[in-house]
Amino acid sequence: MADGAGIDRKADEKIQFSTSKEVTVHPTFESMSLKESLLRGIYAYGYESPSAVQSRAIVQICKGRDTIAQAQSGTGKTATFSISMLQVIDTAVRETQALVLSPTRELATQIQSVVMALGDYMNVQCHACIGGTNVGEDIRKLDYGQHIVSGTPGRVADMIRRRHLRTRHIKMLVLDEADELLNQGFREQIYDVYRYLPPATQVVVVSATLPYDVLDMTTKFMTDPVRILVKRDELTLEGLKQYFIAVEKEDWKFDTLCDLYDTLTITQAVIFCNTRRKVDWLTDKMREANFTVSSMHGDMPQKERDSIMQDFRQGNSRVLISTDVWARGIDVQQVSLVINYDLPSNRENYIHRIGRSGRFGRKGVAINFVTSEDVRILRDIECMWLPSPCFSCG
């Protein structure tokens, strides 16, 4: 049963933590010595009691400790670092004091929304600093002064270099969905940002998956971090059924999808493809067959992506076809089905994709289309995430 903030408490209690010895559990938000105005925002947001990761991580982060926090999708990771940032900033000082870096523009914008909601009684300023938007607006907002900035690495680094994002008051750097951020593409940009920050800046790393190479890399800019880690064999999603459908040829996937579309009763669904070109192709094919779908990928202008996301969040569109730009951390509570039209080549991305379904403890279904070429990837995914094979054959 999910509470008002959408956390599945039953699943939450089953999480196994491999944590640093000094970590204590705080069963209530009141026991964390949080500001009164922040507590009001937490309760107004719908939280009644902290989730497993919140009860362990918030106090450690508020103490100023470098922290690595790992927990599965839908367990309140975003609120964990948002509450912590709101606790440590001084709203009387209109300077940037906390910085969050995310791998996608949509996730950075969502984090801004969570911060503003939780900080509703604190008069907090928080800006989403993301690529694809008006640079002049960024400059205006940053020059005015923002307590918290949530952004993508490229635009944030640019604003720092232009001296519009002032870093001298920054106390905390949060790397959200750190596995993706620290992959090859973002690594150098993160270092670009980090070298401008004060030497004493606290670093918080948050993700559903933390492969060894990511943990290894964090040693370069973290000092004696507190670790709150979920065991790898616990990284499955409660209440989510996973299936594969064997399709002999790539060409057969489309007909299979049309059959599924006709027979399944769903609230909302996300269909993942591996390339932007495939997203466009599949969208056109579905529309030609008189199916109503929307689509989104990284080549689209940011305004168009924002509009598509808003329509999907509000339930105006039921089926979204997307690349992995949508796979990480985006919460739309009514998504009950994820279809991997293409299996992800990155096995970590599989957990992020299927985590879009059954958010916050609701029941969800993930369906994977598997050709003969995909069998190796499927086995790889099985070995990575599932203690014993439990895929059902369609």
Curated annotation (Swiss-Prot):
It is found in: Nucleus, Nucleolus. One of its GO terms (molecular function) is ATP hydrolysis activity. Residues 58-228 form the Helicase ATP-binding domain. Its EC number is 3.6.4.13. CDD domains: DEADc_EIF4AIII_DDX48, SF2_C_DEAD. The gene is FAL1. This is ATP-dependent RNA helicase FAL1. One of its GO terms (cellular component) is nucleolar chromatin. Belongs to the DEAD box helicase family. DDX48/FAL1 subfamily. ATP-dependent RNA helicase involved in 40S ribosomal subunit biogenesis. Required for the processing and cleavage of 35S pre-rRNA at sites A0, A1, and A2, leading to mature 18S rRNA. It catalyses: ATP + H2O = ADP + phosphate + H(+). Residues 239-394 form the Helicase C-terminal domain. ATP binds at A71, Q72, S73, G74, T75, G76, K77, T78. Gene3D superfamilies: P-loop containing nucleotide triphosphate hydrolases (3.40.50.300). Keywords: ATP-binding, Helicase, Hydrolase, Nucleotide-binding, Nucleus, Ribosome biogenesis, RNA-binding, rRNA processing. GO terms for biological process: rRNA processing. Its main location: nucleus. PANTHER family: ATP-DEPENDENT RNA HELICASE DBP3. A motif (DEAD box) lies at residues 176-179. The Q motif is unique to and characteristic of the DEAD box family of RNA helicases and controls ATP binding and hydrolysis. A motif (Q motif) lies at residues 27-55. Pfam families: DEAD (PF00270), Helicase_C (PF00271).
